């Protein structure tokens, strides 16, 4: 299977706080604005499956709100800890809109965040 591009939001409407969490094609996606542009990553810490969108984006990284694990928004690489890297998603601006490319298959258990009260994938 491949990937499919999905419209997310008009670039002009992107939140001023620099981040937006969305469910796209079954994937939990975090789009963040850094000094280098917009980037999209799986909205799930690889350490304990927390939603990274509840954390802060600073200096090109997103920090997990649970234990402070940091991930590079552009590459998904975990910085300063021995946790697995994040999945990244291709992002493009088309006719003023932000589009994200996600796999056609939904995420497995190991890539879905833990959300209290939500059913498992």
Where are these regions (language model features)?
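Short, basic/low-complexity N-terminal boundary segments at the transition from targeting/disordered tails
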Residues: 1-9, 66-77
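N-terminal pre-ligand scaffold of iron-sulfur
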Residues: 1-59, 89-121
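Short cysteine clusters
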Residues: 45, 64-67
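Iron-sulfur (Fe-S) cluster-binding segments and ferredoxin-like electron-carrier domains
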Residues: 51-58, 70-80
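Short cysteine/histidine-rich metal-coordination sites, predominantly Zn2+-binding motifs
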Residues: 59-65, 79-87
């Amino acid at each position: 299977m491949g990937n499919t591009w999905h419209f997310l939001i008009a670039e002009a409407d992107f939140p001023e706080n620099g981040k937006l969490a969305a469910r796209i094609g079954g994937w939990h996606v975090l789009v963040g604005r850094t000094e280098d542009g917009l980037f999209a990553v799986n909205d799930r810490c690889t350490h304990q499956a927390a939603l990274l969108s509840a954390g802060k984006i600073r200096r090109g990284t997103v920090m997990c709100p649970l234990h402070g694990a940091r991930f590079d928004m552009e590459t998904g690489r975990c910085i300063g800890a021995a946790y697995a890297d994040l999945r990244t998603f291709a992002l493009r601006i088309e006719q003023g809109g932000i589009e994200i490319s996600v796999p056609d298959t939904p995420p497995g258990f190991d890539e879905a965040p833990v959300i209290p009260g939500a059913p498992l994938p």
